[in-house]
Design a protein with these regions (language model features):
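Conserved catalytic-core motifs of eukaryotic protein kinase domains, centered on the activation segment
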Residues: 40, 78-85, 120-124, 174-175
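Conserved Rossmann-fold NAD(P)-dependent oxidoreductase catalytic core, especially the SDR/UDP-sugar
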Residues: 68-70, 95-137
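Rossmann-fold cofactor-recognition segment
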Residues: 40-54
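N-terminal Rossmann NAD(P)H-binding glycine-rich loop of SDR-like oxidoreductase domains
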Residues: 1-23
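Conserved glycine-rich Rossmann-like NAD(P)H-binding loop of the short-chain dehydrogenase/reductase
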Residues: 25-34
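NAD(P)-dependent short-chain dehydrogenase/reductase
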Residues: 150-204
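Short-chain dehydrogenase/reductase
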Residues: 88, 130, 134-146, 176-183
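NAD(P)H-binding glycine-rich loop region in Rossmannoid oxidoreductase-like domains
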Residues: 50-90
Length: 204
């Protein structure tokens, strides 16, 4: 199978590349950056283009992948410190990726989402029928990504799948900031020598 991974450098991306190669799939990579910097595991071919590039459609057409996986909520190319601006770029990038891949009649597009779309902590398991209630610009952008995928599935009959990963964290690369609760709490502890918590925070 021909697999096209889309996302910035991260341990998750490395794990996906390793898994695809181990399973014998021909793996391609779109980095989302033009400069070519970044440490990735070796793939069959790597493309250094931003997601909104007009070249993305030509790349997808030439490679003709059976499966495209967009890291979405876990893509390190996005800096959510200015979430209002980044949310616009995020949804525009996803739309361009889906539009570029729409030519493939029997291909599958997988979008990685996260639990942030629910907007709060839950003390028990979240059922898939639980309505999303995203509050931050980042969460709203990620949820909008799910809706965009659904729209392409309904209107273009594309095989789009949304995977919501719950509390998936890792050790950030040296010198890289992260946006997950564990990173934020550790940063707070280093700055203030304490971690604030209240009844709204659940630590299972």
């Amino acid at each position: 199978m021909i697999v096209f991974l889309v996302g910035g450098e991260s341990r998750l991306m490395d794990a996906l590349i390793t898994k695809m190669e181990k399973d014998g799939h021909k793996t391609y990579l779109l980095t989302g950056k033009r400069d070519g910097r970044g440490k990735y595991r070796r793939v069959f071919e790597r493309y250094n283009f931003p997601y909104d590039s007009e070249s993305v459609r030509e790349i997808f057409t030439n490679v003709n992948p059976d499966l495209v996986i967009f890291l979405g909520a876990y893509d390190t190319n996005y800096d959510w410190s200015d979430a209002r601006r980044e949310s616009v770029r995020y949804t525009a990038d996803l739309t361009n990726l889906l539009s570029a891949y729409a030519f493939k009649q029997n291909g599958r597009f997988v979008y990685l989402s996260s639990e942030v779309v629910y907007g709060r902590s839950y003390s028990s398991d979240i059922h898939e029928t639980e309505p999303a209630s995203s509050k931050s610009f980042q969460a709203m952008a990620i949820l909008q990504g799910e809706n965009i995928c659904k729209s392409y599935r309904d209107t273009r009959e594309m095989d789009t799948r949304v995977l919501r990963f719950d509390h998936m964290y890792d050790i950030p690369r040296k010198g890289k900031a992260d946006n997950n609760p564990c990173f934020q709490m550790m940063l707070e502890m280093l700055k203030t020598n304490q971690i604030a918590a209240n009844s709204r925070n659940v630590f299972p």
